Amino acid sequence: MGITVLKNEGLDFHAKISTPLSEIDDDMQKELLDLTKKVKIAGFRAGKVPVSIVKKKYGTSIRNDIIERRINHWVNHVIKEHNLNIIGRPKIEELQNEPDKALEFTVKIEILPKITIPDLKKISLDRPKLEVKPKDVEEQLEKLATLTKSYTKESKVTIKDGDQVTIDAIGYIKDKTFDGGKLNDLKVVIGSNTLIPGFEKQLIGSKTGSEIDVNVTFPENYHAKDLAGKDARFVVQIKAVHTSEPTLIDDEFAKKFQSNNLEELRTHFAKQIENESEEAINTIMKMNLFDKLEKLLDFDVPESLLEQEKNILKSETDKDESLLKDKSSKEITEYYNKLALRRVRIGLLLAEYAKSKNLQLEPDDFKKVIIQQARNFPGQENMIFDFYKNNPKAIEALKGTALEDKVVQYIFNNEIKLKEKKYTKEELEKYLEEEEQRITLI
C-alpha cells in the first residue's frame, strides 16, 4: 500500500492511495473459500462447491465489497495518521479498479478550520427594556372589552364606527374574480381593522339590504403574493347590522378572565405586554451579537459548507422575490457570498464554543424552539405540537436552531456586557420595526 500526499494546505487535503493487486487477490481468495463452505448451488453437495463456480456466480459482488472496504480502511487510516478534523464525506476520484491491476484512487478531504474563540467579554450591547405604562394596560383592557362585546341589538339606521356588520362580498381585479375573493356571512366590527385597509371605512353610512362597491388596494406585504399591491373592487351585500351596549371595565369584567379583580387583570396584562416583546427583542439581540462576531472572525471556511449555505439563501430569497428585486446579478452574487460566509463562520464558532463549554442539548431546548415555531401559527398551535410529537426526524432537524439559541443565551448570561436601555411601548415598536427591516436580509 502506498500513500502520496498531493495537497495539504488551507482546508484541503488530497492524497493518492494504491493497494497492490496481490492484496486484493488474497482477500478475494479468502472470501471465496469461506463462501464455498456456506453457499448452496444446485448440483453440488453442501461445502463441496468448486471455487471456480462460486467465483463465476459471486466474484463481481465479492470484489466490489472488498474494494469498498479497502477504500474505507485506507481513507480512515489517512485521516487518523494526519490527524484530520474533517467536514462531510471524503470524495473518491480517479478510481482505478480493473481486475488485473492494483487498486488506485485519489481521496479529497475538506478540513474544519482551527477556530480561536475571541474574548467575548470585550463585547458590549444595549438590551432594550420595555417600560409598561398604565395607558398601555388600559389600551389592552379596552381592546379586550371590544373583542368580547355582545352584538345582540339589530340596527335599522346607517352603519357607524363600532357596529358589527354581516356581509357577503365578491372581489374583482380588472373585472375578474380571484381566489380568496369571495366572502360569505362574514361578521366584522367597523374600526377593528380586520379587513384590507380602507375596506371597513367604506361601509360606514350604508344600511341593511344595501349593495355597495368597495375599492381597495392590497398592501405590498400582503401574504398572498399574487395579490400584493393590486387594486381590487368588492361588490358588498350588507346582510345585517348589530350594535352593542358599552362594556363596563370593573372587577366583574375581570372575573370573566380568571382574575379575582381588575387590579389583578391589569397586572396580568402588564406582564403579557412585556413578554410579547421579548421574543422580538431576543431575535434582534442575537443579530446584533452576530454583527459584532462577524467583525472578529476571519478564518477560512470549507467550500462545501459555503455552497450549502448559498443554496439555502437562494431558496429563502426565491420564496420572497421582493428581497432582491432591485439588485443586479453581480450584487446578488456578492450578497450570497458575503452572507453565506457570515453564517458559516458564526455557526462554526458557536459549535466550537458549545464544545469548549460542554453545552449539551436537552429536551427543554427543543421544546423552546417548537413553542417559538407554534407562535408563528396562531390558532394552529396544537397542530404544530402534534406534528413534532409524531415526527422524531423533524425534531432532529431543529438541532441546529436549538443549539444556536442555547449557546447565544449562554453568551448573553455569562460573557458579554449588557446595558439596559429603556423604551416606551411606542419607542420600542418603532425600534423593533426598524431593526426587523435591517435584519431581513441577514
From Swiss-Prot:
Q: What class of enzyme is it?
A: isomerase
EC identifiers of the protein = 5.2.1.8
Recite the UniProt keywords alphabetically: Cell cycle, Cell division, Chaperone, Cytoplasm, Isomerase, Rotamase
Its annotated compartments are:
Cytoplasm
Annotated GO biological process: 'de novo' cotranslational protein folding; cell division; chaperone-mediated protein folding; protein transport; protein unfolding
SUPFAM superfamilies associated with the record: FKBP-like, Triger factor/SurA peptide-binding domain-like, Trigger factor ribosome-binding domain
Q: What InterPro entries does this protein's entry cite?
A: PPIase_dom_sf, PPIase_FKBP_dom, Trig_fac, Trigger_fac_C, Trigger_fac_C_sf, Trigger_fac_ribosome-bd_bac, Trigger_fac_ribosome-bd_sf, Trigger_fact/SurA_dom_sf
Transmembrane region(s): none
One GO cellular component term of this record is:
cytoplasm
| Known catalytic reactions | [protein]-peptidylproline (omega=180) = [protein]-peptidylproline (omega=0)
Domain PPIase FKBP-type: start-end pairs = 162-247
One Gene Ontology MF term: ribosome binding
Q: Which family does it belong to?
A: Belongs to the FKBP-type PPIase family. Tig subfamily.
Q: What is the UniProt domain comment for this protein?
A: Consists of 3 domains; the N-terminus binds the ribosome, the middle domain has PPIase activity, while the C-terminus has intrinsic chaperone activity on its own.
Annotated NCBIfam families: tig
Q: Which HAMAP family would you find in this protein's record?
A: Trigger_factor_Tig (MF_00303)
Its biological purpose: Involved in protein export. Acts as a chaperone by maintaining the newly synthesized protein in an open conformation. Functions as a peptidyl-prolyl cis-trans isomerase.
What's the protein name? Answer: Trigger factor
Q: Which organism is it from?
A: Rickettsia canadensis (strain McKiel)
Q: What is the lineage of its organism?
A: Bacteria, Pseudomonadati, Pseudomonadota, Alphaproteobacteria, Rickettsiales
